[in-house]
Amino acid sequence: MAVTVETLEKLERKITLSLPLTTIQTEVDARLKRLARTVKMDGFRPGKVPMSVVAQRYGYSVQYEVLNDKVGEAFAQAANEANLRVAGQPRITEKDGAPEGEVTFDAVFEVFPEVKIGDLSTAEVEKLSAEVTDSAIDKTVDILRKQRRTFAQRALAAAAEDGDRVTVDFEGKIDGEPFQGGKAEDFQFLVGEGQMLKEFEDAVRGMKSGESKTFPLAFPEDYHGKDVAGKTADFMVTVKKIEAAHLPEVNEQLAKSLGIADGTVEGLRADIKKNLEREVKFRLLARNKQAVMDALVSKAELDLPNASVQAEIARLLEAARADLKQRGIKDADKAEIPEDVFRPQAERRVRLGLVVAELVRANNLQAKPEQLKAHVDELAASYEKPEDVVRWYFSDRNRLAEVEAVVIENNVTDFVLGQAKVNDKAVSFDELMGQA
């Protein structure tokens, strides 16, 4: 097979492939013979259809398949011999004027770029740190108590206040007409916890059992119910019951109910601290990893293969449609979503992927078996039966590949932090958790 390689521009290349017609015809004949042994046609016994009839019926499609296969094989062989790392699928077209006895094709494609990573010692990375405080443990204890609270009916003269559970009947109308989801009986919610729109909670707060009132409520423009979003409804609400919340005491009984082995408050707080420290570690790793990747990309020079960018745009577009479909949007598969919306994100993902791959290759940062095991053990530690979770990960190659990708990212993060100028910054627990 004769091969020529031509550089068009930047990452674009062209290979000219020449194939002997005899090679193609030999394969076509072989496939038609195999087909003749199994093909069924009216008027002939199975396996007894004449070759001329088989060729007349199936010759064109078989020749098309053979050409595709042979050109694909020739392209792969040529790219391999030329040490080309092909990005995406080639555009293959047949050329006119081929030498006698040959068929010639042009394959135009992109190659992956050379990645140049600058001096990482001049990169600056802000590295966050945070600690689990007693206050954070106290807040978690309060959350656990709320999850186990009980309710007791309050006196009829008592007014609803934050923390109470109220049972109400309500009906809303827009321009005098009822709307879907605007009416309910014996509906319960907790006042002051954001389960209802603020105007609704404000109206109920201070009401007593047996009282009714009407009030206007403006639905936000971004309200999930599109039929009422941005509109104002008139609501009638009747309070039927008000119940006060009672939180369990922080004692041995609470600790035991939460599965604490020694059944002590100290053991409960220690267990909470351990879990929060694990969460803090993962949050810090994610934030610091993002800072490292930003610094790494800023120090890299490379051209982006358009084929890779377009493939990433297609993935993001598919994910966006799936999200719309999950939200109940009609005809999500047909929704017009401009590709350019995803281009910046796609370009960053492709750029980051290529830079990370080069750093891993150049510095042997691949995931080691002991690192995979340690990471899986850490993921499994928070489960009731960690050994089952470990087996679950190692029993599936795809799941293990996801773990491997995370470990490689961690290796890259550690490597860059060891090279770059690191600015340490302590943040509060609440700030890290997005609660500040």
UniProtKB/Swiss-Prot annotation:
- Specify the domain of life of the species encoding this protein: Bacteria
Its GO biological process annotations read: 'de novo' cotranslational protein folding; cell division; chaperone-mediated protein folding; protein transport; protein unfolding
A GO CC term assigned to this protein in UniProt: cytoplasm
* Protein EC: 5.2.1.8
Matching InterPro entries, A to Z? Answer: PPIase_dom_sf, PPIase_FKBP_dom, Trig_fac, Trigger_fac_C, Trigger_fac_C_sf, Trigger_fac_ribosome-bd_bac, Trigger_fac_ribosome-bd_sf, Trigger_fact/SurA_dom_sf
| An example molecular function term from Gene Ontology annotations | peptidyl-prolyl cis-trans isomerase activity
Task: Return the SUPFAM superfamilies for the record.
Answer: FKBP-like, Triger factor/SurA peptide-binding domain-like, Trigger factor ribosome-binding domain
Describe the location of the PPIase FKBP-type domain by residue ranges.
163-248
**Pfam families xref list:** FKBP_C, Trigger_C, Trigger_N
Q: Does the keyword Cell cycle apply?
A: yes
Task: Quickly give the catalysed reaction.
Answer: [protein]-peptidylproline (omega=180) = [protein]-peptidylproline (omega=0)
What are the protein's UniProt keywords?
A: Cell cycle, Cell division, Chaperone, Cytoplasm, Isomerase, Rotamase
Q: Looking at the keywords, is Isomerase present? A: yes
Disulphide linkage map: none
Q: Where in the cell is it found?
A: Cytoplasm
What HAMAP family does the record tag this protein with?
Trigger_factor_Tig
Q: What is known of its domains?
A: Consists of 3 domains; the N-terminus binds the ribosome, the middle domain has PPIase activity, while the C-terminus has intrinsic chaperone activity on its own.
Q: Which family does it belong to?
A: Belongs to the FKBP-type PPIase family. Tig subfamily.
Q: What is the purpose of this protein?
A: Involved in protein export. Acts as a chaperone by maintaining the newly synthesized protein in an open conformation. Functions as a peptidyl-prolyl cis-trans isomerase.
Q: What protein name is recorded for this chain?
A: Trigger factor
Annotated source species: Acidovorax ebreus (strain TPSY) (Diaphorobacter sp. (strain TPSY))
Q: Which gene specifies this protein's sequence?
A: tig
